[in-house]
Amino acid sequence: SLAALAAALIGLAAMAHTATAAAPGLPVAENGKPVKVFATGVAVPTQIAFKGKTAFISGGPENNKPGGLYYVSPGSKKAKRVPDTPPIAFGVTWHHGHLYANFGTVIRVFHGWTGKRFRFSRTLVSFKPKNFTNFSGLEFGPNGRLYTGVGLQFDAKAGTKAYANSVISIDKRSGRIRTVSTGLRQPWMLTFVKGSRSPLVTVLGQDSPKGTLAPDLIVKATPGANFGFPRCNWSNVKACARLHFKKPVMTFAAAEPSPSPMGITAKGEKLFVALFGGLSTDEGPIGPEIVTTSSHGGIVRNFVTGFKAPVLLAHYHGGYLYMGDLSGKVYRVKA
């Protein structure tokens, strides 16, 4: 349910409580460029999209603060709610003059932006909550179809609701759905590397039973691929390989706090990944951060650290990396 997903986000914040003790001030980027506040006022910023210099941000709720679809006007740093939209949103993307927004069990398409509201909107696809969990991040593929993940129903077993534990693609006109990849516990955000027909997807590993070694994943969601969940959670790579499940591009080992890859975005072959809990070293947890790696997997490097709260959003646009955390702020840095 949406309530369960919202609760899960808040629960992740509790898991990553060590991250909230970061030093005061702004996050710090390894490239030496200053990190600046781009916008404030979004409870749980999950995804950002741009129409020219206007930004649209999807926001989940946090405690008593509603989420929803927000906009940030050029020259302003205050996020405002788009009128007549629901108080919860988990994904947003701009494509060919239209804004696509995920309100949990409904994806709507907007156009005719006046600077303060949209003049037109329609429902692209809708499910009843009793039959469906939720959509996650939104991203268009080079084939012109809208890709998204479908959320978990249970922590460590397969969901029984429509399309649960899968990545799907949607026809942007008819709303017809096609299953792309299955066996994914909680696919979250997606990105397409230039030249690739399949998205890279962040996937959150299971939390139970206590002490589970199930890692978080980044996968390449190719048509027909099965990544094994719940039969395989990639805590035993050899066992998963013997069962012929498709291998993830990379894994983040289980830790406390959990790394929890959320937002993912590409600049060429380089990936920027938002880690809700961050990596852990011999000296202890780094805290929420943005890391870089290759679209083929490989070395993971710290890129932006020092967030005061768990970080969810990562989006590369126009020479800047945009990042958002549970303090309600969206930042940007040249990257």
Language model: regions and residue ranges:
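A short beta-strand motif characteristic of beta-propeller blades
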Residues: P34-T40, K78-D84, R122-K128, R176-S181, ...
